[in-house]
Amino acid sequence: MDLPEAWAGRGAWTVLDTDFQNGQRFLNLWRAWQRDPRRPRLLHYVGIASVVPRVDVHDSAPDDEGRSLARVLAAQLLDRGAGFHRILLNQAQVSLTLCIGDAQGMLGEQVFQADTLLCAAPADKWAVQLLARRCKRGSRFWMDTTPQHGATVTPETQLPALLQATGFELDPAAPVNALSGSFNPRWNIPTSRTPSSHVAQVASRCAIVGAGIAGASVAHALARRGWQVTVFDQEVRPAGGASGLPAGLAVPHVSADDNPRSRLSRSGTRLLAQHADRLLVRGQDWEPSGVLEKRPDGGALWHPQACWIKPAALVQAWLASPEIAFVGNTQIAALQRSDELWTLHDPQGLDLGRYAVVVLANAMGCAALLKGSGPGVQLKADLLAKL
């Protein structure tokens, strides 16, 4: 790999690892990121594993620093199951998205573009095409072609031609049992790429309407990525609506077949706890106490990962960033699109600023706001009404 030289001075760096295994490559890269004074502000590592990884704390590193990172990762992997999991580390500057399940299926659900790819040998040409869809021009890759017991892979003699036909350029001097290179197709990418590839928008100005849990969490996420965010709310203070209840319980949904709703809520509960642990005071604003759910039939179910939390405290913590400005006691009545920017207006028609992106997080109020805006925006209100 050509890291950390390649990421020097960058705002963010995304790595795709299709063979996460025991997480050792992630631990090595995380450690390199911590030590590098020119590291990117954000490191996003997407790892795909067929089963929940098992981290061997003692064998993962020869020193205390490495073992400390391994212990943190091992603790975050406890009680994880199939599906997608977002794990925040280093004050949320390092994001690990762990995808547990069939590698090809998981890869097909991704929509980002990676700067670096760490790959196992692909099973067929379709797998190579999935890798290409996760690339942008210049993305670097490193592929381990070591034969894996029981794995179905493309024969090593066919891989170079297959990769080149898909747009990859190969380095002439790769190590034994490995291929490396970059994605640099001869054709124009925008006209040959499916619309599922989302290009990250350059950080700019964003307006968010609504300062509850939804709006504050989006504001916090955008601010971490370098955006300047203004949050508007009709209440005087953030969390003035339902998000301002004195305390609440965060408990995952449970189903007999562990359906997507259950998996999503379980991952969401774990992610909420990570934010709370980083931003709030245990015992005062929240507590990972676990929750006992009493069933109507008289039974009970213990949720070890559940917690109680004061939502308003979390909202305030999310908004406490120099990149975020809160504007209260302000109603947004209309949106207007012009010159690729959005202008917000209050009920008196006063211009409240122009923004590259607007996020509506004002619950049922968004329908009325869309209807009161221009024709193109009103169409979105009609679509919303059908949901």
Question: Which positions does each model-derived feature cover?
Answer:
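SAM cofactor-binding core of SAM-dependent methyltransferases
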Residues: 2-5, 10-78
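Short beta-strand to alpha-helix junction loop
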Residues: 144, 259-268, 301-320
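Dinucleotide-binding Rossmann-like beta1-alpha1 core, especially the glycine-rich loop
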Residues: 247-303
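S-adenosyl-L-methionine
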Residues: 59-109
